Design a protein with these regions (language model features):
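Structural motif
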Residues: 94-95, 140
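Short, well-ordered alpha-helical microsegments
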Residues: 27, 104-108, 127-131
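Conserved N-terminal subdomain of the carbohydrate kinase-like
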Residues: 10-94
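Catalytic beta/alpha-barrel core
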Residues: 97-102, 121-122
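Conserved phosphate/ATP/ADP-binding segment of small-molecule kinases
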Residues: 113-118, 122-182
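Histidine-anchored nucleotide/phosphate-binding helix
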Residues: 2-10
């Protein structure tokens, strides 16, 4: 989520990020970077003693992931109650971007109560299944090939297979039109 928020800021968009941060050097870095690019963290929370979510990606010579290590435990603090307390703010957004590092119950609660359009990033094949019950509540989805295969049930071996996978995703109730699958 932070990478998407960061890049939207760089594109000149007004962005607020609702998240949780730990009490560590990574959180300080996130706050400093957010200030530098104009990313609003007003509706975020600091978890006493918490470790800010981290993700390390190691690419091979071909650019594909060879290894990834993460610590996302802090996102368990983004509960339905955490979201409920911020829902008025969230519902006034032009677009809500969420991802599957959130607990499944929180993702489902958000999708049931959010009146703003929602774009979801599956983030990984391990976490993508959390989106299956809420696909019909989403406005847009940002899967990679493997995540699209998992959520659509369609094997994508060539570029010609992608439209069939997109159709299957739209049949799940994904809102809007063909442009919803980005």
């Amino acid at each position: 989520g932070r990478n998407i928020a960061h890049n939207l800021c760089l594109l000149g968009e007004e962005v607020s990020m609702v998240t949780v941060l730990g009490q560590d050097s990574f959180a300080q870095s996130v706050r400093e970077n957010a200030t530098a690019i104009g990313l609003d963290l007003t509706h975020s929370a600091v978890i006493p003693g918490g470790r800010t979510g981290t993700y390390l990606f190691i690419a091979g010579p071909d650019g594909d992931m060879e290894l990834a290590v993460n610590d996302m435990d802090i996102y368990e603090h983004i509960t339905p109650e955490f979201l409920r307390q911020r829902m008025d703010f969230i519902n006034h957004a032009d677009l809500v971007v969420t991802e599957t590092n959130l607990p499944a119950a929180s993702l489902q609660w958000l999708c049931q109560h959010c009146t703003a359009p929602i774009l979801a990033d599956p983030v990984s094949t391990i976490k993508a299944p959390k989106l299956a019950p809420v696909l019909g509540k989403l406005t847009a989805l940002k899967p990679n090939r493997m995540e699209a295969e998992l959520l659509s049930g369609v094997k994508i071996e060539t570029a010609a297979d992608a439209p069939h996978a997109a159709e299957k995703l739209l049949e799940t109730g994904l809102q809007q039109d063909r442009k919803s699958v980005v």
